[in-house]
Amino acid sequence: MSMQDPIADMLTRIRNGQAANKVSVKMPSAKLKVAIAKLLKDEGYITDYAVASEGNKAELEVTLKYFQGRPVVETIQRVSRPGLRIYKGKDELPKVMGGLGIAIVSTSKGLMTDRAARLAGMGGEVICYVA
């Protein structure tokens, strides 16, 4: 069976891994998934990520982050999905948890956080919320 929404699968693997107190989670790799992992690392939500190639299949391993035994990622939620794309202009970009969380936005300049997109004066597709 083919995977309908690989980004939702990635976010669910991270959510489930942290609920089970796993050190890391593995998933099939893709450019968009690596870009999301890079943003999560830059914003301090995960410890690290690595891409390993096994034959013709690349695998993304995300090392999860905990603070005092609790997951750093409290909520991670898919917004735009294949059946219902959500686009927001630069003035309509949401502030997640009043600015404490981030929204990952796909713009014409690549993936960036909602703060970076506002500073760049760009809108785009809202991929997910992380808090």
From Swiss-Prot:
Part of the 30S ribosomal subunit. Contacts proteins S5 and S12. GO terms for biological process: translation. One of its GO terms (molecular function) is structural constituent of ribosome. The gene is rpsH. It comes from the Bacteria. Keywords: Ribonucleoprotein, Ribosomal protein, RNA-binding, rRNA-binding. Belongs to the universal ribosomal protein uS8 family. The keyword Coiled coil does not apply. GO terms for cellular component: ribonucleoprotein complex; ribosome. One of the primary rRNA binding proteins, it binds directly to 16S rRNA central domain where it helps coordinate assembly of the platform of the 30S subunit. This is Small ribosomal subunit protein uS8.
